[in-house]
Amino acid sequence: MQTILGASVQIARELARELTHSFSADLRLVSRNPHKVNDTDTLMSADLLDGSQTLNAVKVSRIVYFAAGLPPDSSLWEKQFPVMLQNALNATRQVGAHFVYFDNTYMYPQDSRRQTEDMPFQPSGRKGRVRAMMANMVLEEMLRGEIPVLIGRAPEFYGPGKTQSFTNALVLDRLKAGKKPLVPLRDDTLRTLIWTPDASRALALLGNTPDAYGQTWHLPCCEEPITYAQFVSQACSVFGKETSWSVLNKIPLYIAGIFSKGPRELRELLPRYEADNLFDSSKFKSRFPDFRITTYRQGLENLYTEWKATSALNKDD
């Protein structure tokens, strides 16, 4: 049995697909209100803030994946994320399962240094400090050595379905709505983006590779970073739209934060858009040279095809 904790987020749904498709896994999906991804999935409703519910959710599991998400609310992150993670670690240790932690890069310095798995944590802002604390909790569990543990870390997403990211919200969702794309701060800095299904495929592969444990892995991205100018140009071409976008500077974003909690919560992430983002996934590519990485063009074409198919179904309804 392989169990996904936090199974409602997009990365978890893609992970469920991959585990069933490529590893024929008996799969349990756990969240407050889980829904099947595959016909054979077992569903379990659980509150990860409750230790006993978390323990019950992972019983008889061989591998436990932690992919839980929360809304971008710093207070919520500080109160709930460490508790959820500690409950998951305790429960996994108690049943003797493997633990796979899906992570992001919020704890990394927001500058142009090349990011490798041994990059020191230098979090900026409350959410970054929470993610650093959580990563350290997992690293401590790894050092404890009682259960096999690994970390799979991803940069910013773009992708299908309900993928949540700046890139989806400001570029891709706006193209779908017939609006001009927006770019945060600069369109000439290099970005490293990961196609959500690639992140999930890689996480499933790591979880089912015995010698991957005891390590942190950067999940695989395209070889060459891309500027937002290049990415938006490709997206406009795929969507058949005029190649045009607007660059949002800090002033309107900060003004928006005065009146709305959403922009205010995301402001701490803005410095990363002023510098190149160079996320190095060469370690994964060296260990898994046959892993197929989706190019930006392929990802955009897949997303466009999915959107058109969904739009057609909605019209029929």
Task: Tell where the protein language model's regions lie, with residue ranges.
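N-terminal Rossmann NAD(P)H-binding glycine-rich loop of SDR-like oxidoreductase domains
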Residues: Q2-S22
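Conserved Rossmann-fold NAD(P)-dependent oxidoreductase catalytic core, especially the SDR/UDP-sugar
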Residues: Q86-R131
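Conserved loop-to-helix N-cap of the C-terminal "lid" that shapes the substrate pocket in Rossmann-like
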Residues: I151, D187, T192-S200, T216, ...
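Glycine-rich "substrate-gating" loop/helix at the edge of Rossmann-like oxidoreductase active sites
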Residues: P155-S165, L185-P197, C221-E223
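NAD(P)H-binding glycine-rich loop region in Rossmannoid oxidoreductase-like domains
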Residues: H35-V95
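Mid/C-terminal beta-alpha module of Rossmann-like enzyme folds, strongest
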Residues: Q2, A202-L266, S281, T295-Y296, ...
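A conserved pocket-lining segment of Rossmann-fold NAD(P)-dependent short-chain dehydrogenase/reductase
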Residues: D173-I194, L205, D211
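Conserved beta-loop-beta element that borders a ligand/cofactor-binding pocket
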Residues: N104, N136-G161
